[in-house]
A protein has these predicted regions:
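N-terminal beta1-alpha1-beta2 module of alpha/beta enzyme domains
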Residues: 1-76, 173, 343-345, 356-361
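N-terminal small/glycine-rich loop or linker at the start of catalytic domains
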Residues: 1-21, 115-118, 157-172, 263-274, ...
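Conserved, mostly hydrophobic/aromatic
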Residues: 3, 41, 49, 67, ...
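Hydrophobic faces of well-ordered beta-strands that scaffold small-molecule active sites
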Residues: 3-7, 45-47, 76-78, 106-110, ...
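Active-site mouth loops of central-metabolism enzymes
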Residues: 14-27, 81-89, 172-182, 273-282
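Internal, glycine-rich beta/alpha segment that forms the wall or movable "lid"
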Residues: 16, 87-195, 210, 214, ...
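Glycine-rich, proline-tolerant flexible connector loops at the mouths of alpha/beta enzymes
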Residues: 44-67, 82, 114, 201-204, ...
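Aromatic-lined glycan-binding groove of carbohydrate-active enzymes
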Residues: 185-191, 196, 209-220, 224-262
């Protein structure tokens, strides 16, 4: 089981002080968050991708490459790579380059994002969002697996005898998660390729999230990649912790009330009851996270969002310390104890390379 942090890279005013960090401060804070995640023993840091204010995460591979040079163990990922508006050729080359720089500590999450205007900014039509996602990923999948590609589609110029460079490290493409919060077509796509499926698990009730994950699991088995319970699932979650729940709720309430997506509707208490948001003690976060397994089955990756509401960096780092010291060690033990032997771990470069070598050896022996 992998545990980590995911961020969307927003620049948000702290409602308790009225201070808004500069873009430079926010970019550097994201790096600091990643370094803290490795320091406390977490496994993954994932950054989003946005091309509009109030976000600064416009170039994920630039940031992840910088973090790669400062870390040794952390898996570097994205909480969204925009498969709809990025050229698949550029994605193939950028993430292969990052693989080489990070010695394979790379995977990525494909998504369509949640900002409609980004489509025309990059010359695309939002009404074609799903077809774009399907076609672009089909090309990306081939670019990483075929040395020479001839390709023609609807949304970009054809390719003739094209080779993307550098080639994936050790001939092993980065593992891909397909992220979606509402689109069954994306769950179907993840299942078709035998890739992972990730739900951010923040704003939606468990009944909604369960429908998409269950669809993905059924279709994963349908396409012959393994049993439904062997499908590779990742979840997000938003948490805020203090030693006791009363202090956590008191401190977090102004951030909730002033948040553009959460404030102004249900109360904090109602929101926590209706969604996976957990504000309370470390034990409450442990209990809530373990309950995800009851709702969605055994899964492979749990990422927490701890920085998305304007909380100052000092507070964010305190949250990561609590995760590393009090929450994740318990979760690792509890998730491992109940995990059937046939349920796989999250793929890594090392495990994918080992599987590739084994497959090649088997083919050579039988051939």
């Amino acid at each position: 089981m992998q545990f980590g942090i995911f961020t969307v890279g927003d620049v948000t005013t702290d409602p308790t002080t009225g201070r808004t960090p500069t873009e430079a401060e926010r970019v550097k804070a994201m790096v600091t968050i990643a370094l803290k995640a490795e320091e406390v023993g977490l496994d993954v840091f994932a950054t989003g991708e946005h091309h509009n204010p109030p976000f600064v995460a416009s170039s994920p591979t630039t940031m992840l490459g910088y973090i790669a040079a400062k870390t040794d163990r952390l898996i570097l990922s994205t909480s969204t790579t925009l498969i709809t508006t990025n050229d698949p050729v550029k994605i193939a080359e950028d993430f292969a380059m990052l693989q080489h720089l990070a010695d394979g500590r790379v995977d990525l999450m494909m998504g369509r994002g949640n900002t409609g205007p980004v489509y025309p900014w990059f010359g695309q039509d939002i009404r074609q969002g799903i077809p774009l996602a399907l076609e672009n990923y089909n090309l990306l999948h081939r670019l990483w697996r075929e040395d020479v590609v001839d390709w023609e589609g609807k949304f970009r110029t054809p390719l003739q005898g094209f080779t993307s460079t550098p080639r994936p490290l050790d001939g092993v493409p980065p593992f891909v998660w397909h992220g979606s919060i509402r689109s069954p077509e994306i769950a179907e796509q993840a299942a078709f390729y035998g890739d992972g499926f990730f739900h951010n698990n923040i704003f939606w009730p468990a009944t909604h999230t369960k429908k998409l994950i269950s669809l993905y699991r059924r279709r994963f088995e349908h396409y012959g990649h393994g049993r439904a319970e062997q499908a590779v699932v990742g979840l997000g979650g938003q948490v805020f912790m203090r030693k006791n729940s009363q202090d956590a709720v008191r401190e977090f309430r102004p951030y909730f009330d002033h948040h553009p997506l959460m404030g102004g509707g249900p109360s904090l208490e109602e929101y926590m009851d209706q969604t996976p948001l957990t504000v309370g003690s470390p034990q409450q976060v442990i209990d809530r996270t373990l309950a995800f397994r009851d709702s969605f089955g055994h899964y492979q990756r749990q990422l927490f969002n701890v920085d998305g509401v304007g909380t100052p960096l000092k507070t964010v780092l305190e949250q990561i310390d609590i995760l590393g010291e009090e929450v994740v060690p318990v979760l690792r033990e509890e998730f491992a104890a109940g995990r059937p032997a046939h349920v796989p771990d999250a793929p890594t470069h090392a495990s994918l390379l080992s599987a590739r070598v084994a497959a090649n050896t088997s083919a050579a022996t039988t051939g």
